Amino acid sequence: MRILLPSQEQRLLSVIRPGEPFGPRDRALITFAIHTGLRSHELCGLDVGHVMTRDSFPRQWVEVVGKGDRVRQVPLNPIARQAVLDLVHFNRSRGFAVAGSSPLLVTRCHRRLPTRSLRDLIQRYRERADLDIQCTPHTFRHTMASRLANCASLPVVKTVLGHARLSSTQVYTHTTPAQLVAGMDRLAES
């Protein structure tokens, strides 16, 4: 299965040590990725101004350019907005720029985090957590889409993911055995 179960997500986040130099950033970054489903290039391409207002409040939406240069707006839930605040706080506390045009995700050298480095850091935490599941930004995308499909319609999931066709979205929705049982139980009740 290409999604993280809540217990796996907690295990992954629990191995990120807050005392490590980039631990707070990495925890907020992974949380943000899981709650937005953004692609790796979309995450790494974010500037502070994409997610924060000029008044230093997290935005309700983030506008990203996806595949095919299609622009879409992704709503930020309360957990994603808190992750934004944590990322900006981390940058400020480490002396990284927090102006609107500054990269949200930065390296030790104050440069934009490359997508390869993003994948590497996620892999490092996956190994530390001893998860037996592939863990990439795309796994987080599948996780978000699958969770969203449990509480919203497929057209909503399609729009958030930025898909042109509903058939593309269906690949991202994963059903667990517990969901199948619950669905059949609801059928019996109707």
Each model region followed by its residue ranges:
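Conserved catalytic core of the tyrosine transesterase superfamily
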Residues: 1-190
